[in-house]
């Protein structure tokens, strides 16, 4: 059975576009007989691990910055325990949603080392704004910095729309194609069925 792991800093029961997109991908993959794991943030008092409708959900400990809008991973004992559990799996594909969270960097780093394929799906079309000139400037510096780090771990980027692909160009990233909210399962299946293992191609040790 093929196995896919999806890193998404935010997920249900938090409601938003990325959360719904992640859920839809997971359900569509599941219908294809694929084993799906979601790695998200433990924003509220939810369990660190549970299985919902056949989908395994790991919730990494985090700081709830900006009232939960910007969950930031806590690299503590609980984090290390959950990551050890994940490293025991053999994933065919790791999908990381968005690229500007610390969670995203964790996802692409994990995917590069422990999965056959490793991709990022972009959801944004502009910089985040908190309507404060100084904080917005700091956000831009941070976003460019973390995107640079993400690019070092992953070279396959997609967008949920053409506008997202164009926004990737702002960071000197050439997006491959779109994976719309409707989810083009043919594209996902093509990724899963490609024979080349990125770890072997780039001599990445486990």
Task: Describe each PLM feature range.
Residues 1-56:
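N-terminal subdomain of nucleotide-sugar transferases
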Residues 4, 93-95, 108-128, 143, ...:
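Active-site proximal beta-strand in glycosyltransferases
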Residues 39, 58-60, 179:
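Hydrophobic residues at beta-strand termini and immediately following loops
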Residues 42, 163, 182:
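Carbohydrate-associated surface elements
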Residues 49, 189-204:
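A short helix/loop element that forms part of the nucleotide-sugar donor recognition site in Leloir-type
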Residues 62-94, 101-109, 113, 140-149, ...:
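An amphipathic, basic-hydrophobic alpha-helix
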Residues 98-100, 161-162:
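Helix N-cap/beta->alpha junction signal
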Residues 116-117, 126-153, 159, 166, ...:
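Nucleotide-sugar donor phosphate/pyrophosphate-binding loop at the beta->alpha transition
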């Amino acid at each position: 059975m093929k196995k896919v792991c999806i890193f998404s800093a935010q997920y249900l029961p938090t409601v938003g576009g990325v959360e719904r997109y992640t859920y839809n991908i997971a359900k569509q993959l599941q219908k294809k007989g694929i084993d799906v794991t979601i790695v998200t943030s433990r924003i509220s008092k939810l369990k660190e691990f549970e299985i919902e409708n056949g989908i395994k959900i790991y919730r990494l400990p985090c700081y709830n910055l900006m009232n939960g809008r910007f969950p930031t991973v806590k690299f503590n004992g609980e984090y290390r325990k959950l990551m050890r559990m994940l490293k025991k799996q053999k994933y065919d594909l790791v999908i990381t949603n968005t690229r500007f969270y610390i969670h995203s960097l964790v996802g692409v780093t994990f995917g590069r080392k422990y999965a056959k394929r490793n991709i990022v799906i972009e959801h944004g079309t502009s910089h985040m704004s908190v309507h404060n000139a100084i904080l917005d400037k700091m956000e831009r510096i941070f976003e460019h910095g973390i995107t640079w780090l993400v690019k070092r771990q992953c070279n396959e980027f997609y967008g949920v729309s053409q506008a997202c692909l164009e926004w990737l160009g702002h960071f000197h990233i050439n997006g491959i194609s779109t994976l719309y909210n409707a989810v083009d399962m043919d594209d996902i299946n093509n990724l899963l069925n490609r024979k080349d293992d990125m770890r072997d191609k780039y001599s990445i040790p486990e």
